Curated annotation (Swiss-Prot):
Residues 1-49, 315-334 are annotated as: Disordered. Its main location: membrane. Residues 22-37 have a biased composition (Low complexity). This is Probable transporter mch1. InterPro entries: MFS, MFS_trans_sf. The chain crosses the membrane at residues 63-83, 96-116, 122-142, 164-184, 202-222, 241-261, 355-375, 405-425, 453-473, 486-506, 516-536, 565-585. Belongs to the major facilitator superfamily. The keyword 4Fe-4S does not apply. It is a multi-pass membrane protein. GO terms for molecular function: transmembrane transporter activity. It comes from Neurospora crassa (strain ATCC 24698 / 74-OR23-1A / CBS 708.71 / DSM 1257 / FGSC 987). Glycans are attached at residues 57, 325. One of its GO terms (cellular component) is fungal-type vacuole membrane.
């Protein structure tokens, strides 16, 4: 057998030389893996273990602070009904605000996740500070002007002015949604990359995600106990929306600025190097799909990378010892940056071409949308439980109470699922993307897949929705805790387990981008189910008005007909989602058939 022809030097390559020969393919793979002296310099200059541990702990504290404050949008139900009462918004208009915020919270996630993976979580935290300050500042100003005008009977100075004011309020909640997305993503990505490669990856992700759920609880309690209206006779009124918005704007701006400096990825070069080694051990780097898909001229690579072996050699990657006019440190930084981009873009393309990801993402969409709609409309749902023509003993239950119940159950279940999956779920030998079977697993007396946990809590979520839809809670507001507790537990577990499963199957190097793509889907679900609920609710309002029961309260609906059909449909949506996730796991060419440990 003839010996292989050695790869030509750059000065020997003519226009007719093929850009991707077998030798250059293996050369590319080995060069991307090692980057020769550049990689050695990175390893020699790496942070000491003690300093790295301190940096990780500081970043974790900063991520925890960001997560504890970022979930302000989850308490929308505390003031949604006030918009109806003071600003005379219809249920459709109130849901328009919550849907705009939900849409803005989820839709930019792929772009912001891509930015987080490429430039780091710090700049993303600063982006969140700017959006939160602008959003809550604008919302406070619009609310103050409209509420004062309505109190004086000016009707917001005319219909056109009212439309402009509503458009400004929509813009404010879009800003708040983008700020929420940015702060949450920067915090979770920091924890995923700093701690997500160890055996406690579930807890490392569950803690900031749980803290995000907890943020709604403490903010709702602070609002109801501190930021309330005080009347001249000393009695306590409803939430003081204007001052509460000002407080949230200032708080979140400060927290976002602190995260700009506190959120860091420690030893990221090692993370990328290990990812490349894992890809090569799996044989993925030697496959034509990976290299040719990225480097051939007729099939450009995913994203901004479109490099041939000649381009890579010219850039100093295939031959890092090649002299260059730039300093060694600049060459080293360039090589590290190109290698990082190469790996991240490759993993993004692999993620997008995995059919099980789309089943999983669609299932997440059908689970989270109903949960979001329930949480956003807590305030108006609770009001339907207390028809004004009936006398009730004691104080009616409040939206703040059930926002706190959702927050507490969500937080506890997120921590519980993170801990239990670390203890009971099987662990792959690979710490990065699982491309083929992980081989022999560590023997355990008992193991339970993370997907089993996900399906169990999804069913729990659907039971909470069905309980409300059944009418069992109508005229019995004291029972509402059953629905809010079950929905909070299911919603929290699904939101915690989904990113954990993503890190286990597709690795942590490209986590922000991968999670961002999946997290985009609930925006459509929350918007859709919010509109369904609004349509059912508004139908009840119009029916009551036609029967002569509207009067001064003509924007409100009372009775199970205001919500029952909407929440039955939401429960069915969650059941369909369970089927999709089960198919991705156990179906044809699913994770189980491919030997992927999850």
């Amino acid at each position: 057998m003839a010996s292989p022809t050695p790869a030509p030097r750059p000065d020997q390559i003519s226009a007719s030389t093929p850009l991707l020969q077998s030798d250059s393919t293996s050369s590319c793979a080995s060069s991307i893996r090692s980057l020769s002296p550049s990689r050695r310099r990175h390893r020699n200059g790496r942070t000491s273990p003690a300093a790295a541990a301190s940096a990780r702990n500081l970043s974790f504290a900063s991520a925890l602070l960001s997560s504890l404050c970022a979930g302000s949008i989850t308490i929308f139900s505390m003031y949604g009904h006030i918009f109806q009462e003071r600003l005379h918004y219809t249920q459709f208009e109130v849901n328009g605000l919550s849907s705009a915020a939900s849409f803005a919270t989820y839709m930019p996630v792929p772009l912001l996740g891509y930015m987080c993976d490429r430039v780091g979580p710090g700049p993303l935290s600063f982006v969140s500070a700017l959006f939160f300050a602008a959003g809550y500042g604008l919302a406070a100003g619009v609310y103050k002007r409209e509420a004062d005008g309505a109190a004086l009977g000016n009707g917001a100075d005319g219909e056109d002015t009212g439309r402009l004011a509503y458009a400004a309020m929509i813009t404010a909640f879009v800003f708040i949604g983008v700020g929420t997305c940015s702060m949450y993503m920067s915090a979770v990505a920091t924890c995923a990359k700093n701690f997500g490669r160890g055996k406690h990856r579930g807890l490392a992700l569950a803690v900031p995600i749980a803290a995000f759920g907890l943020s709604g609880m403490w903010q709702s309690q602070l609002g109801s106990r501190v930021f309330y209206e005080r009347f001249a006779d000393g009695t306590k009124g409803d939430l003081d929306v204007f001052h509460f918005f000002i407080f949230l704007g200032v708080l979140l701006f400060v927290v976002g600025c602190l995260g700009t400096f506190g959120l860091k990825i420690v030893d990221e070069e090692d993370l990328i190097d290990e990812a490349v080694e894992e890809l090569e051990r799996s044989g993925y780097l030697d496959g034509s799909t990976f290299l040719q898909g990225s480097w051939t001229a007729d099939r450009p690579g995913y994203g901004a990378i479109e490099q041939s072996p000649l381009d890579m050699e010219s850039a100093g990657i295939l031959d890092p010892s090649k002299p260059d006019n730039d300093s060694d440190s600049e060459e080293e930084d360039d090589n590290a940056r190109i290698k990082k981009t190469w790996v991240l873009n490759a993993e993004t393309r692999r993620f997008l071409t995995d059919h099980t990801m789309w089943c999983f993402a669609l299932g997440f969409f059908l689970m989270i949308g109903p949960g979001e709609a329930f949480i956003n409309n807590l305030g108006t749902v609770i009001k339907t439980l207390y028809p004004p023509h009936l006398k009730f003993v004691g104080e009616p239950t409040s939206a703040a109470t059930h926002v706190s119940i959702v927050g507490i159950t969500s937080t506890l279940v997120r921590l519980l699922t993170g801990s239990l999956t670390d203890l009971l779920a099987p662990s792959p030998q690979a710490r990065h993307v699982q491309i083929t079977s992980s081989g022999t697993l560590e023997r355990k007396r008992f193991s339970l897949s993370r997907v089993s946990f996900l399906l169990f809590f999804a069913v729990t979520l659907s039971v909470g929705l069905a309980t409300l839809a059944s009418g069992w809670i109508q005229n019995h507001g004291e029972r509402f805790w059953v629905a809010s507790g079950l929905v909070g537990a299911g919603y929290g577990a699904v939101f915690s387990l989904t990113p954990i499963i993503i890190t286990v199957i597709w690795g942590v190097e490209n986590f922000a981008t991968n999670w961002g793509i999946v997290a985009m889907f609930p925006a459509l679900g929350a918007t859709f189910w919010g509109l369904v609920y609004s349509a059912v609710y508004q139908s009840g309002v119009e029916k009551a008005a036609s029967n002569g029961q509207g009067g001064e309260e003509d924007q409100f609906c009372y009775g199970s007909e205001c919500y029952a059909s909407a929440f039955w449909a939401m429960a069915a949506s969650v059941w369909v989602a369970c089927g999709l996730v089960l198919w991705a796991w156990k179906g044809k060419n699913g994770w189980a058939q491919r030997g992927i440990v999850v």
